[in-house]
From Swiss-Prot:
Region (Disordered) residue spans: 37-61
Residue stretches spanning the membrane: none
Keyword RNA-binding attributed: no
Record flagged with keyword ATP-binding: no
Subunit structure as annotated in this protein's UniProt entry: Forms a complex with PtlF.
Induction, per UniProt: Cotranscribed with ptxABCDE. Activated by the two-component regulatory system BvgS/BvgA.
Biased composition, class Polar residues, residue ranges: 52-61
Disulfide bonds: none
Signal peptide: 1-25
Species the sequence originates in: Bordetella pertussis (strain Tohama I / ATCC BAA-589 / NCTC 13251)
Name of the featured protein: Type IV secretion system protein PtlI
Function per UniProt: Component of the type IV secretion system ptl required for secretion of assembled pertussis toxin (PTX) through the outer membrane.
Length: 61
C-alpha cells in the first residue's frame, strides 16, 4: 500500500509540475488548472504525455 501511495504522491507532484507548463504552451486562453482546452482530466499522465506531444507543437520531440 505504501508503494501505491508514494506513486500517487509522485503522480500528483508531476501533474502539479507539468500543468503550468502545458497551460503556457498549449492553452494560453484556457482556464487555470486545466492543461487542455478540451477539459481533459489531469490524472492520466500516460495519456497526457503523448497528447502533449501531438497538441503542443512548441516543444521539439
Amino acid at each position: 500500500m505504501i508503494h501505491a501511495h508514494s506513486n500517487a504522491r509522485l503522480l500528483r507532484w508531476a501533474i502539479l509540475a507539468i500543468a503550468p507548463v502545458t497551460l503556457g504552451a498549449c492553452a494560453p486562453n484556457g482556464p487555470p488548472g486545466l492543461p487542455y482546452p478540451d477539459g481533459k482530466p489531469l490524472i492520466p499522465i500516460n495519456t497526457a504525455a503523448p497528447e502533449q506531444g501531438s497538441s503542443c507543437q512548441t516543444r521539439a520531440p
